[in-house]
């Protein structure tokens, strides 16, 4: 019997103006879909003119300049609508959605939808079940005592997954998809009996525990810092009085 992680998966990734999910903007995004291990990968790409300058530090990471985005990018409102509809369509088929560090990409998309569409990611999903698989959360739970960084590049190296063109949204999404397959194979005895819906719920619990552990480490190091326990989407911040 083929396990779900060898079957249909989709994966989503973004490149952005920075790391603040409340203020930064999406400049490119990609969704990849694959029906089975080794099957053809279908890629949908979006390029966005964010309407604000892209910091030099962000351009150094993903290579997208203000000039390139102004010439080739589309305005955010229709792009965010397309992205959200595409994610909803994929999830409606029952495909698990792979998102590396999901609270970043999905929260940023949610804030862009609120900014440009007066809507939310939950509004687009409506009754569509969201079954996210986050390779970062999986690896951190399943191999919790391993030292070292857990970036996409590091995890791909560890699990022997090719990553060509890191910090390109399509390349990162494709690598994240293969990374989930590789992690689930390695830890198959612990995961194969879980449905995607059950794994989604467990990851929310695991991520919250990981956030508490990181907060404790920060406090012990003398640099207290809050870590949001929400997964896969951070709640909207309350409006300022």
Kindly give the residue locations of the regions a language model identified.
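Short, surface-exposed acidic-centric catalytic microdomains
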Residues: 42-62
């Amino acid at each position: 019997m083929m396990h779900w992680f060898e079957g249909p998966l989709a994966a989503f990734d973004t490149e952005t103006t920075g790391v603040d999910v409340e203020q930064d903007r999406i400049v490119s995004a990609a969704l990849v879909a694959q029906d089975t291990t080794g099957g053809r990968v279908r890629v949908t790409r979006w390029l966005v003119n964010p309407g604000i300058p892209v910091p030099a530090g962000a351009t150094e990471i993903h290579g997208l300049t203000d000039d390139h985005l102004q010439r080739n990018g589309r305005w955010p409102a229709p792009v965010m609508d397309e992205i959200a509809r595409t994610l909803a369509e994929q999830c409606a088929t029952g495909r698990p959605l792979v998102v590396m560090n999901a609270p970043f990409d999905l929260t940023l998309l949610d804030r862009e939808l609120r900014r440009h569409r007066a809507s939310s990611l939950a509004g687009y999903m409506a009754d569509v079940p969201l079954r996210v698989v986050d390779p970062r959360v999986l690896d951190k739970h399943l191999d919790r005592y391993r030292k070292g960084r857990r970036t996409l590049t590091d995890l791909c190296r560890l699990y022997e997954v090719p990553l060509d063109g890191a910090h390109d949204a399509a390349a990162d999404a494709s690598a994240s998809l293969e990374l989930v397959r590789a992690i689930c194979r390695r830890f198959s005895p612990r995961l194969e009996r879980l449905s995607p819906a059950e794994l989604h719920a467990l990851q929310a619990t695991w991520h919250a525990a990981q956030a508490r552990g990181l907060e404790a480490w920060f406090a012990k190091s003398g640099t207290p810092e809050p870590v949001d326990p929400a997964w896969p989407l951070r709640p909207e911040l309350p409006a300022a009085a």
